[in-house]
Design a protein with these regions (language model features):
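Second RecA-like catalytic domain
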Residues: 1-175
Length: 175
């Protein structure tokens, strides 16, 4: 609710909508995803952010659970799959991403943009962290698959998940 919007700086401490909050509201999407799109302009990562936002707007892509919890695999599938069974969902995600990219181009660009010249996995983590800052997670020592979120809650990944041995995670969805 309001506390979340204040944490994301979309509302002021007094509950007034901020300039960023007004920009985000113009996208007509979940505030976290809208914030990710706005933040993406600062790093020139708009197309990537739109793809991520479109992916996160869907429950999951066909076969998504098979690849574990890493959104990087879903993003690759979005970009490369040509299987007929995936066509409807992935086409909808691609269309949504393109629509948001068009909306972003129509918005005044960020004044101080610094291109993000790191591997795509780090760019994805940065974008997700900008939308879900309280869900940054550090691995718990000696407990593979066990993480402590920035907000203080614990989170677990199955040992079979490739991310279970990661030192840190930028989390976009908790089940």
């Amino acid at each position: 609710g309001q506390q979340q919007l204040k944490l994301l700086k979309l509302l002021s401490a007094r509950g007034q909508i901020t300039a960023t909050g007004r920009e985000v509201a113009g996208f007509g999407m979940h505030p976290r995803l809208g914030l990710m799109l706005i933040q993406a302009r600062h790093w020139r990562l708009e197309p990537l952010a739109c793809d991520l936002a479109a992916l996160l707007s869907e429950r999951d892509i066909p076969g998504g659970r098979v690849v574990g919890s890493d959104i990087v695999h879903r993003l690759r599938r979005l970009r490369t799959s040509d299987r007929a069974s995936d066509h409807v969902v992935l086409s909808r995600i691609r269309r949504q991403s393109l629509q948001w990219q068009k909306q972003l181009r129509a918005v005044k660009p960020a004044v101080k943009a610094t291109p993000f010249n790191e591997p795509e996995e780090l760019a994805i983590a940065r974008l997700i962290a900008s939308a879900f800052p309280e869900w940054l997670a550090l691995a718990r020592a000696g407990r593979s698959g066990s993480f402590l979120l920035r907000q203080g809650r614990g989170a677990m990944l199955p040992m079979s998940d490739p991310l279970s041995s990661a030192e840190a995670l930028a989390v976009a969805r908790l089940d």
